[in-house]
Amino acid sequence: MRRRRAEIRKVPPDPIYNDVLVSKLINRVMWDGKKSIAQKIVYKAMEILAEKTKKAPLEALHQAIENVRPIVEVRPRRVGGATYQVPIEVQEPRKTSLALRWIVEAARAKKGRPMAEKLGEELVNAFNNTGTAIKKKEDVHRMAEANRAFAHFRW
C-alpha cells in the first residue's frame, strides 16, 4: 500500500490549440511513446470534426467529449458473500478520462481506414450524440439504473 495518496500530474497543454483536453486525447491515442504520430492523427481528426460540424475545432471537441461523459457507473461491492453492482456518481476527472477512452476505443474498433479518419468520424458521431462511444455511455447508465436498488450499499 502507498504511504500517501499519489499526486495527480498536470498535463501540459498541446502546442497548437493550447488546450489540456487535446493533450489528453493525444496521450490516449499515443502508442509506444510515439507522440508526434499521435499528434498528427489527433490534429487531422480535429480538422475533420471542424469540417463536418461547421464549428471551431476546439468548441466541437469539447462538446463531443461533454456528450460522452458518464454521470453514474456501477462498482462491484461484496456484501455477505454476494457481490452487488452498486451505482455511484463518477468523479469529474474520471468522467473526462472515461469519455476519452471510449472515443478512442470506438475509433480503434473500426477497421479499414486511417486512424485519423476513424477518430474524426467518432468525434463527429459523439458531437451528434450517436455512435459507439455514446452507446457505451448509455449502456453504463442503463446498468446503473437497473441496479438502483443497491444504491444504499454506497460507501
Swiss-Prot record:
<keyword id="KW-0699">rRNA-binding</keyword>
<comment type="subunit">
    <text>Part of the 30S ribosomal subunit. Contacts proteins S9 and S11.</text>
</comment>
<keyword id="KW-0687">Ribonucleoprotein</keyword>
<dbReference type="InterPro" id="IPR036823">
    <property type="entry name" value="Ribosomal_uS7_dom_sf"/>
</dbReference>
<dbReference type="GO" id="GO:0003735">
    <property type="term" value="F:structural constituent of ribosome"/>
</dbReference>
<dbReference type="InterPro" id="IPR000235">
    <property type="entry name" value="Ribosomal_uS7"/>
</dbReference>
<keyword id="KW-0820">tRNA-binding</keyword>
<comment type="function">
    <text>One of the primary rRNA binding proteins, it binds directly to 16S rRNA where it nucleates assembly of the head domain of the 30S subunit. Is located at the subunit interface close to the decoding center, probably blocks exit of the E-site tRNA.</text>
</comment>
<protein>
    <recommendedName>
        <fullName>Small ribosomal subunit protein uS7</fullName>
    </recommendedName>
</protein>
<dbReference type="GO" id="GO:0000049">
    <property type="term" value="F:tRNA binding"/>
</dbReference>
<dbReference type="GO" id="GO:0015935">
    <property type="term" value="C:small ribosomal subunit"/>
</dbReference>
<dbReference type="InterPro" id="IPR020606">
    <property type="entry name" value="Ribosomal_uS7_CS"/>
</dbReference>
<dbReference type="GO" id="GO:0019843">
    <property type="term" value="F:rRNA binding"/>
</dbReference>
<dbReference type="InterPro" id="IPR005717">
    <property type="entry name" value="Ribosomal_uS7_bac/org-type"/>
</dbReference>
<keyword id="KW-0694">RNA-binding</keyword>
<dbReference type="GO" id="GO:0006412">
    <property type="term" value="P:translation"/>
</dbReference>
<keyword id="KW-0689">Ribosomal protein</keyword>
<comment type="similarity">
    <text>Belongs to the universal ribosomal protein uS7 family.</text>
</comment>
<dbReference type="Pfam" id="PF00177">
    <property type="entry name" value="Ribosomal_S7"/>
</dbReference>
<dbReference type="InterPro" id="IPR023798">
    <property type="entry name" value="Ribosomal_uS7_dom"/>
</dbReference>
